[in-house]
Amino acid sequence: MDPISNDSSEITYDYSDGTPNPDMPADGVYIPKMEPGDIAALIIYLAVFLVGVTGNALVVWVTAFEAKRTVNAIWFLNLAVADLLSCLALPILFTSIVKHNHWPFGDQACIVLPSLILLNMYSSILLLATISADRFLLVFKPIWCQKFRRPGLAWMACGVTWVLALLLTIPSFVFRRIHKDPYSDSILCNIDYSKGPFFIEKAIAILRLMVGFVLPLLTLNICYTFLLIRTWSRKATRSTKTLKVVMAVVTCFFVFWLPYQVTGVILAWLPRSSSTFQSVERLNSLCVSLAYINCCVNPIIYVMAGQGFHGRLRRSLPSIIRNVLSEDSLGRDSKSFTRSTMDTSTQKSQAV
C-alpha cells in the first residue's frame, strides 16, 4: 500500500475495456479529479500537521531534559521523535495530493519521505513493545529492575528498535521510484514491484501485517492481561498512571493503523481488474491519513492524563507532560514490592 498514490502494485496501463485511460474524455483532454477520500485526507493531514508538530516538539523538549536520568522519558522521547519525523513530511505529501499525485520533489525525496510513515509504524510498535516489556518487568521482576533498569540500557533498547525498524522499511526504499504518467505531464512517485519476484508484493504485505500489526497485537494483549491482573490485585499499584497512558497509546495505534493494514492486504491480493480492488484503491489516501492521526494523538493523551482535578488551569502544558511521563508510582511500588519480597524470603529462611 502506497502512502503517495493509489497505485501500489506493478505499474501497468492496460485497461479491460480497451480505452487508453478510463478517466480521459473522448476529446482527449485529461481533466484530473480529486476523490472525496483525497479531500478528507487533506483535511486530516492539515490537522495532524498542526497538532502533531506542535505536540511532539513539546514532548521532545520536555523529555529531552529528563532522558538523562529517567527511563520513562527515554521511551516517550523516542516515540515523539518517530511521530515528529512523520509529521514533518506531511507538507510534501499534502502538496502531492493537491497536485493530483504529481511529484515535483525528485527521486531521492520519493524514496525517503513516503517511507517515513512505514518507519514510524515499525519504530512505534517496536517501541511500544519495549515499553510494555519494561512495564511487565517492573511488576513481575522488581528485584531485577532495581539492579539493571538504567537509562543506558533503555538507550540501547531504543537503538535496537530503530535499527530493526529501518531494516523492515528497506522494501519501501528499494521498490519506490518516480516515473512519468503517459497520459499527462505528471511525475508520479509510487511502489513498483515489476522488477522483483512475482510473489514479492504479497510477501511484503504479509510481513507488514504480521510484524507491524498481528504479532504485536497478540503479544501486547497477553502482556497487558497479566499486568492488569497483577496491578489490580495489589493496592500498591492501583494508581499506576504510566500503565494507563501506555495502554491508551497502544489502543490508539491499533485503531488508527487497522484500515491501512486491511486495505494494504486487499490491494496486494486482489487482481487490479476487480471491482473491489478499484473501490478500495480510492480509499488509499484516506486510510494513510487515518494512520497519520496516530502521529499526533500521543501528546493529546499525555495532556489528558495529566489533567488533575486541582489546578488544571494553573498548570502549564510542559509541567503536565513532565508529570505524566515521569517515573511514576509503579517504579516506587516496585521498590516497596522488592523490599516486601526480600522481607518475606528472610522470614522464611529464619523459620527454616
Swiss-Prot record:
Spell out which residues are annotated as carrying Sulfotyrosine: 13, 15
Q: Which residues lie on this side of the membrane: Cytoplasmic?
A: 66-70, 134-154, 229-244, 306-352
- What this protein is called in its record is C5a anaphylatoxin chemotactic receptor 1
Q: Gene encoding this polypeptide?
A: C5ar1
Q: Which segments carry the region annotation Disordered?
A: 1-20, 332-352
The record's account of how the chain is modified after translation: Sulfation plays a critical role in the association of C5aR with C5a, but no significant role in the ability of the receptor to transduce a signal and mobilize calcium in response to a small peptide agonist.
Residues in the Extracellular compartment per record:
1-38, 95-111, 176-202, 268-284
Q: What is the annotated quaternary arrangement, including any partners?
A: Homodimer. May also form higher-order oligomers. Interacts (when phosphorylated) with ARRB1 and ARRB2; the interaction is associated with internalization of C5aR.
Q: Matching Pfam families, A to Z?
A: 7tm_1
Would you kindly state one Gene Ontology biological process term found in this protein's UniProt entry? Answer: positive regulation of vascular endothelial growth factor production
Localization (cell)? Cell membrane; Cytoplasmic vesicle
Tagged with keyword Transmembrane helix: yes
Disulfide bond sites: 110-189
